C-alpha cells in the first residue's frame, strides 16, 4: 500500500469513529447532558445535539473528501473546547479516583483526535 492509501484509510477510520460519536449524541443525549458546563444557558439536549451534528458533518466531509480542511479545523477547535470546558474541570474537581481517571482519559482522547484533525487539515488541499 502506498502512503496516500494508508492516509485515506486513516481519515475514513476517523470519520467512522466521529459518526458513531455523533449518532450516540442523538440516541443517548440523557447520558451526555450532565457534562454540559453550567455557565451555558439551560437549553436541555440542544447542547448535546449540536456537537453530535458537528461530529456527523465532519464524518461526511471526511468520507466525501469535500471541505475536509474546514471540517478538520472545526473538529479540532470543538475537541479543544471540550478539553478545556468539560474534561479538564472534571479532572480537577473529580470526586473519586475513578472519575479523575475517566476525565484524564477523555482529555487524552480528545487531544489526540484533535491533533489528528489538525494533521488532516494541514495536509488537505480542500
Regions found by a protein language model. Give the residues of each.
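Short juxtamembrane and helix-loop transition motifs at transmembrane-helix boundaries
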Residues: 9-10, 29-42
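Extended, low-polarity transmembrane helix blocks
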Residues: 1-27, 47-53, 57, 63-126
Amino acid at each position: 500500500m502506498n502512503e496516500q492509501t494508508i492516509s485515506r484509510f486513516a481519515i475514513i477510520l476517523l470519520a467512522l469513529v466521529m459518526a458513531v460519536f455523533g449518532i450516540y449524541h442523538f440516541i443517548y443525549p440523557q447520558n451526555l447532558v450532565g457534562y454540559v458546563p453550567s455557565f451555558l444557558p439551560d437549553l436541555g439536549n440542544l447542547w448535546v445535539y449540536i456537537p453530535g451534528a458537528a461530529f456527523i458533518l465532519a464524518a461526511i466531509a471526511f468520507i466525501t473528501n469535500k471541505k475536509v480542511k474546514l471540517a478538520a479545523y472545526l473538529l479540532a477547535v470543538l475537541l479543544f473546547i471540550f478539553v478545556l470546558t468539560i474534561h479538564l474541570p472534571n479532572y480537577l474537581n473529580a470526586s473519586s479516583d475513578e472519575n479523575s481517571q475517566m476525565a484524564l482519559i477523555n482529555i487524552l482522547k480528545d487531544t489526540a483526535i484533535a491533533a489528528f484533525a489538525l494533521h488532516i487539515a494541514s495536509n488537505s488541499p480542500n
